[in-house]
Regions:
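Glycine-rich Rossmann-fold phosphate-binding loop(s) that bind the pyrophosphate
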Residues: 29-32
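Helical element adjacent to the flavin cofactor pocket in flavoenzyme catalytic cores
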Residues: 203-285, 290-291, 303, 310-315
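Conserved FAD-binding subdomain of flavin-dependent enzymes
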Residues: 72-113
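C-terminal segments that line or cap access tunnels to active or ligand-binding sites in enzymes
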Residues: 208-220, 283-285, 290-417
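Short, solvent-exposed loop/turn and secondary-structure capping segments
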Residues: 64-67, 197, 297-302
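Extreme N-terminal leader/targeting segments of oxidoreductases
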Residues: 1-25, 43-51
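Rossmann-like flavin
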Residues: 100-207, 219-220
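Glycine-rich FAD pyrophosphate-binding loop
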Residues: 42-69
């Protein structure tokens, strides 16, 4: 959807690109970004689905937008997306993706109606003393100095923020405020993280600021995001004949590099453990998602903790990005993002209640019936005095279509792990 002056151009269908039926696309990974690109290739690019190839190293699509019932582990969600009105690309796409719940409507219709009928807001943003109200009371707690520090960061040139941590630009006037409690737990920021990243988040989500204390700016799906978002996209792509190649790991991309030219020439991949090559031409498009946020994740269980593995997994997205970047500086600097995992990792857990012991505590804190099928916590609840700076949430229940009646499935994460 293209916005210019008014909406004259917004709803017109693109002209079919000349020769598109002779082109092919290879998408490395099957997370939300790759699936979105594939959907746009089908809808707007009008590329035949049989010419679109999604190469995924796992046996299932979705990337970080997961939600799965693992034998012996139970329900697992590694994270969740907090969505708002200004996800323009996503909403433009989902108006064209048919619902898998209701015939004749789109995913966007379904999502919009749900959040109109059951708007999101939190009645308890933070607690202390094991469940008592922390009385953030919708306030930011910022002094004039703190507000000026945030404003100064917003207008600082990017180049002046290279290699600077947040503690170089914010004093205790910000770092001890409610604003920072809201922000850091919502976006998983540590004090030592990048000041430039903080600035970029401020610019991208400035419209969130008014809704930070109670999450009124946010929207959530009915079920976990694999079932509510990824599955409808998969059904749409499969219906158009898009080719999915699971258990297929792209380990390298070779390039034809000359002055004024950078063209992918070959994909090197492992399919079920055997090496293969795909030679590329000028009629082939390649879409990469290097450096995924769950690329190096590891699962624990009821009996053992999730192992911390500081080394990058060989043959993964980060490893591939490093190989590509070594060939040309224009391909970025991945080590800026992955060289200090002890400073960037965090731990999450999916919890399933099997009896009636925990739900009353959830209800007492969030002040809503968690079994109502409506908004429960309305976003994360942060235990302000937790050594982990632990936050937890229960979204609309059930979170999984096959979730047994009487159970709750929630998500917990510790910023300090």
């Amino acid at each position: 959807m293209y916005y210019s002056s008014g909406n004259y151009e917004a709803f017109a269908r693109p002209v079919k690109p000349e020769g598109v039926e002779h082109k092919s696309a290879y998408l490395v990974g099957s997370g939300l970004a790759a699936l979105t690109a594939a959907c746009y290739l089908v809808r707007d690019g009008q590329m035949p689905g049989r010419n679109i190839h999604i190469l995924e190293k796992e046996p299932i699509a979705g990337g970080a937008c997961d939600g799965w019932h693992y034998e012996g582990l139970g329900y697992v969600m590694r994270g969740g997306r907090e969505m708002d009105n200004h996800f323009e690309v996503m909403w433009d796409l989902f108006r064209s993706i048919p619902s898998i719940e209701t015939e004749g409507v789109s995913v966007l219709d379904e999502y919009y109606w749900l959040n109109k009928r059951d708007p999101n807001y939190s009645l308890m943003r933070a607690t202390v003393n094991r469940g008592e109200d922390a009385h953030t009371d919708g306030k930011f707690g910022l002094s004039d100095q703190g507000a000026m520090e945030i404003m100064k960061l917003f207008f600082t040139p990017d180049e002046a923020l290279y290699d600077k941590p947040i503690t170089d630009v914010f004093s205790s006037a910000v770092l001890e405020s409610n604003f920072w409690l809201y922000w850091r737990t919502m976006f998983a920021f540590e004090n030592w993280h990048s000041a430039l990243e903080m600035k970029l988040y401020l610019k991208r989500f400035i419209h969130h600021v008014g809704g930070l204390p109670d999450f009124t700016a946010l929207r959530f799906t009915r079920y976990n995001q694999y079932e509510s978002m990824i599955l409808p996209m998969l059904k749409y792509l499969e219906a158009h004949g898009v080719q999915f190649h699971f258990n297929t790991r792209v380990v390298d991309v070779e390039f034809d590099l000359r002055p004024g030219r950078k063209q992918a020439s070959r994909l090197v991949l492992l399919r079920d453990g055997a090496e293969e090559h795909i030679d590329l031409t000028e009629n082939d498009l390649v879409f990469l998602t290097p450096g995924g946020c769950v690329e190096n994740s590891a699962l624990g269980s009821q009996d053992s903790p999730a192992p911390f593995r500081p080394e990058l997994k060989p043959g993964g997205g980060w490893d591939m990005w490093r190989r590509i970047a070594a060939r040309d500086p224009a391909f970025g600097r991945p080590d800026k993002f992955c060289s200090q995992p002890e400073l960037s990792n965090w731990m999450s857990a999916t919890v399933t209640t099997l009896d009636d012991k925990i739900p009353p505590y959830v209800q007492r804190i969030c002040q809503r019936d968690p079994f109502s099928g409506k908004v429960v916590t309305g976003g994360i609840v942060t235990a302000r005095d937790s050594n982990w700076l632990l936050s937890w949430t229960f979204n609309r229940q059930p979170q999984f279509r096959d979730q047994p009646r009487g159970q709750l499935v929630g998500w917990i994460y510790g910023l300090f792990s």
